[in-house]
Each structure stands twice: as structure tokens, then as C-alpha cells.
């Protein structure tokens, strides 16, 4: 800011101010962080990206740096990547029993594409890493192309995208296919070329895992079509799509059972669920008076069965496919979230914050 220097933390997806420091400390702190990240401390006119590796309590912590010049000096974002917190077990991601079975069935296929969709910060990478951990067994060749490589995994060959030297997702993927892979993970399908190569790879005997930025599982089909992938290729290659969001967990220390409001009862009834009580955190020192501590994922899974393939080939709208999902008993993001409210894991407000009502 113009007269002060703010330090803010994003905890469980919510940004809060930790403290404000005198303006004269800004340049000193900025320079020190840039030195630690091997950045050019004399360059403050352009954005820079760096990395700090450190050990805290005998745990290796990776910190990603991003600097940005603003009118009041450089802004720095430090993203903490703690390898010890990476989910290596699909059962610990927060799936309902039905969704866990659906997801395991999708990634058990020997070939095809499995897509995980959602906005930035929705836990897509963590879910991909959990899937890779379970698939990473003796006799399986797994190669990934990522931007960036967030967590280094033993037994998996990981490629870092470097667009400045021409190593794009598409270029990396073309090279990967000459390396005899069984499973390929693409950090993100961003363009038509990457989508085409991923589709081709899935049709030639490879299991491809990747992510897309769409709001729902159904919209991933529309996105591939909008990129230029023909419907017959989508139906031939796509195994399934899963949308994901993160919601805050009710604090274990201060969570209390309270009666549901009339509005909550209406929302649950509209989604075929009954509710009388929910759990809500009242705030304590453990959760910094927020009532929440930690996060869990809510999901929406669309397996591509014969009927869905016919709908895709007929260029049916996303709403038509969504209606079919409801008829088959598949849960939307909202319904999955409300089920987790009933379990006492989160609150209705959290679910409505990330999942739209229909």
C-alpha cells in the first residue's frame, strides 16, 4: 500500500491480514526474499518467478515465489508446497463411497482419458497425484508433463514445461509418447494441439489423466468440442470427467450440533434430502475463531456410458446430459456437498459458496 506494507495469509482458501509493517521495511524484506529465491534483486520492473527449498521440523518444504511490480512497489506471493501433506491415498480425498468406486473404476481402465475439472485452487493437482500414487506400481511406466512440477514423486518421470525454450505441453507430450509410457499425466489441457495429442494417445493404448478449467463435469465435454475435438473422438477417448471444489471443514474442537434453518431445510428438500440439525463451529483458538479448520473436497462425476456417448454424438446440450445424470442417480456438486453437511463435515454456507443451486 502507499503508507504501509501488509502481510496476508490465505488459510483454507480465505485471505486474511496477518499484520501491517512500516513502509520502510518493504524493500529490505523484498530483497531478502528475492535472494532466497535466486531472483534478480536489481530488477523490479518485470514479474519474476522463483523457488525456495527449506527444511522445517525435519520436513522439506518447497516455496514457490512470484513477484509483481505494482505502483506501490513489488508484490510477492509465496506458495507453500509441503510434500508431507500430499494425498497418496484416494480414500483420504473425501469421496463418498459411491464416488470413490466410480473414480477408481475410471482410472482402472488401460486406455482413455480421465479429466478432473474445476477452477484454480480446487485441489485438482492433489487428486491427480493421489491417483498416480495408486497407479504407481512395479511394471507401469508413468510420465507426467506439468507446469509447474508441484511435488516430486518417486518412480514417476516428471517433465517441467519450459515455454521459453519451446518445451510446451504439446511438445512434451509428443516426446513422451516415444518413451513407451503406460500412463500419461498432463498438468492441463490448454489448447487444441494438446487436446489432439492427448486424444490420439488415449486411442493408441495409453491412460491419460489431465485437468480442465470448467465449472462442471458435463461442461468438460463442451470445452473439448469448443477446442475443436470432434464428437466421435470424444466418445472414443473420454472415460469420464470429475468436477471438484474445496470447502472448509467444521472445526473438530468447537463444532456443535445446531438446528437447521428454514432456508437450509428448503435447499435440502429441493435436492431430495432431509435435514433437521447440522454442525457448525462457534470459533476457538485452534481455528482462529473462524469455526473452520482444514478443507475437504466435494465432487461431481460423469462416467461416459453408452447413453452419454449417444448424447454427445447427437450434440446434445450440457443441460440434457445433466438431466440424464440426475435420472441415473449421479450427484451434482451441490448434492455431494449437502451430503457432507449431513455428515457434519462442513456447512451449508460453504457448499453454496462453491456450488451453484439449480
Question: Which residues make up each language-model segment?
Answer:
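Short, flexible helix-loop junctions that flank or precede catalytic/ligand sites
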Residues: 1-358
Amino acid at each position: 500500500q502507499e503508507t504501509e506494507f501488509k502481510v496476508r495469509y490465505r488459510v483454507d482458501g480465505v485471505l486474511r491480514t496477518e499484520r501491517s509493517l512500516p513502509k520502510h521495511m518493504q524493500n529490505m524484506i523484498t530483497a531478502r526474499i528475492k535472494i532466497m529465491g535466486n531472483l534478480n534483486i536489481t530488477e523490479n520492473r518485470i514479474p519474476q518467478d522463483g523457488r525456495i527449498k527449506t527444511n522445517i521440523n525435519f520436513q522439506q518444504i518447497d516455496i514457490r515465489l512470484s513477484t509483481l511490480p505494482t505502483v506501490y512497489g513489488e508484490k510477492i506471493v509465496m506458495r507453500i508446497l509441503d510434500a508431507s501433506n500430499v494425498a497418496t491415498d484416494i480414500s483420504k480425498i473425501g469421496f463418498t463411497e459411491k464416488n470413490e468406486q466410480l473414480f477408481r473404476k475410471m482410472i482402472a481402465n488401460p486406455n482413455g482419458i480421465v479429466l478432473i475439472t474445476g477452477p484454480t485452487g480446487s485441489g485438482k493437482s492433489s487428486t491427480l497425484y493421489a491417483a498416480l500414487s495408486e497407479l504407481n506400481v512395479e511394471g507401469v511406466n508413468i510420465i507426467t508433463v506439468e507446469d509447474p512440477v508441484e511435488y516430486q514423486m518417486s518412480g514417476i518421470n516428471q517433465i517441467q514445461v519450459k515455454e521459453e525454450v519451446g518445451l510446451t505441453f504439446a511438445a512434451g507430450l509428443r516426446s513422451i509418447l516415444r518413451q513407451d509410457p503406460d500412463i500419461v499425466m498432463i498438468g492441463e489441457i490448454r489448447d487444441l494441439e494438446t487436446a489432439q495429442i492427448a486424444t490420439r494417445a488415449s486411442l493408441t493404448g495409453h491412460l491419460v489423466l489431465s485437468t480442465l478449467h470448467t465449472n462442471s463435469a458435463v461442461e468438460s465435454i463442451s470445452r473439448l468440442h469448443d477446442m475443436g475435438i470432434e464428437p466421435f473422438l470424444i466418445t472414443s477417448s473420454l472415460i469420464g470427467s470429475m468436477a471438484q471444489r474445496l470447502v472448509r471443514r467444521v472445526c473438530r474442537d468447537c463444532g456443535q450440533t445446531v438446528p437447521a434453518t428454514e432456508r437450509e431445510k428448503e435447499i435440502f428438500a429441493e435436492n431430495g434430502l432431509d435435514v433437521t440439525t447440522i454442525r457448525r463451529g462457534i470459533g476457538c483458538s485452534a481455528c482462529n475463531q473462524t469455526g473452520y479448520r482444514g478443507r475437504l473436497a466435494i465432487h461431481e462425476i460423469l462416467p461416459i456410458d453408452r447413453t452419454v456417448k449417444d448424447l454427445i454424438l447427437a450434440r446434445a446440450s450440457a443441460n440434457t446430459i445433466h438431466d440424464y445424470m440426475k435420472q441415473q442417480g449421479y450427484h451434482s456438486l451441490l448434492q455431494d456437498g449437502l451430503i457432507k453437511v449431513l455428515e457434519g463435515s462442513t456447512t451449508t454456507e460453504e457448499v453454496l459458496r462453491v456450488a451453484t443451486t439449480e
